[in-house]
A protein has these predicted regions:
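…primarily DNA-binding HTH/wHTH and HhH modules…
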Residues: 1-2, 89-156
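Glycine/alanine-rich phosphate-binding loops at beta-alpha junctions
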Residues: 4, 8, 12
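Terminal helix-turn-helix DNA-binding modules in bacterial transcription factors
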Residues: 11-16, 21, 25, 44-82, ...
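Short coil turns linking two alpha-helices in DNA-binding domains
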Residues: 30, 34-35, 82-84
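Short hydrophobic/aromatic patch on the recognition helix
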Residues: 38, 42, 86-87, 91
Length: 157
C-alpha cells in the first residue's frame, strides 16, 4: 500500500525546515489544501498532529547535543525554540523529565532515579519509533511518472 503523496510532501517540507517557524497557514498556502483537511489527514496517516510531530522531532534532534553542549539554552535555540522556558516545557512533556534531569541521564549521574531513567528510556524509544515510522512511510510513496526525453542520436560514419 502506498503512502499519501500530500502527507509525504508535507513531511519532507517539515523535515527540511524543522528549525524554522512552521504554521498550518503556511502549509495550507504551500500545498493548496484547506488547513482542517491537512490537519485531519496528517493525524490520520501519521498518528500525531502536525505540531506534535514538529515538536517531537525538534526534541528528538536535540537529544544528541546534550553530550556536547554545556548550555541548555544553546540546545534550545539550535533546535528552533525561541526560549528555554518553552523548550523545557515541551521537553518535559515529551521526554518525561526536564532537560537538566536528561543531562544527568546522559552523564549517568546519581541525581536521577531508576524510575526517571525508565521514563526517559521509554519516551526516547517512542521518539525513535516515530522517526522510523515516518522514514518507512516516506519510502512507501507512490512512484511518480517522470517525463523522459528521448534523444535521437545518429551514428557518425
Amino acid at each position: 500500500m502506498y503512502s499519501n503523496n500530500l502527507i509525504c510532501d508535507i513531511l519532507e517540507y517539515i523535515n527540511k525546515n524543522i528549525y524554522k517557524e512552521i504554521d498550518i497557514t503556511s502549509l495550507s498556502n504551500i500545498f493548496y489544501y484547506d488547513k482542517t483537511y491537512i490537519m485531519k489527514k496528517f493525524k490520520k496517516e501519521i498518528g500525531v498532529s502536525i505540531f506534535d510531530y514538529i515538536n517531537r522531532m525538534k526534541i528528538f534532534n536535540s537529544l544528541s547535543l546534550f553530550q556536547y553542549d554545556n548550555y541548555i539554552l544553546n540546545i534550545a535555540l539550535n533546535n528552533g525554540f525561541n526560549s528555554i522556558e518553552y523548550y523545557s516545557e515541551i521537553f518535559k512533556k515529551i521526554v518525561g523529565v526536564n532537560p537538566k534531569k536528561y543531562r544527568y541521564f546522559v552523564n549517568r549521574s546519581k541525581y536521577i532515579t531508576d524510575r526517571e531513567i525508565d521514563i526517559v528510556i521509554d519516551n526516547v524509544n517512542k521518539l525513535n519509533r516515530l522517526d522510523i515510522f515516518v522514514k518507512r512511510y516516506l519510502e512507501r510513496r507512490r512512484p511518480t511518472e517522470k517525463m523522459v526525453k528521448v534523444l535521437g542520436i545518429k551514428k557518425i560514419k
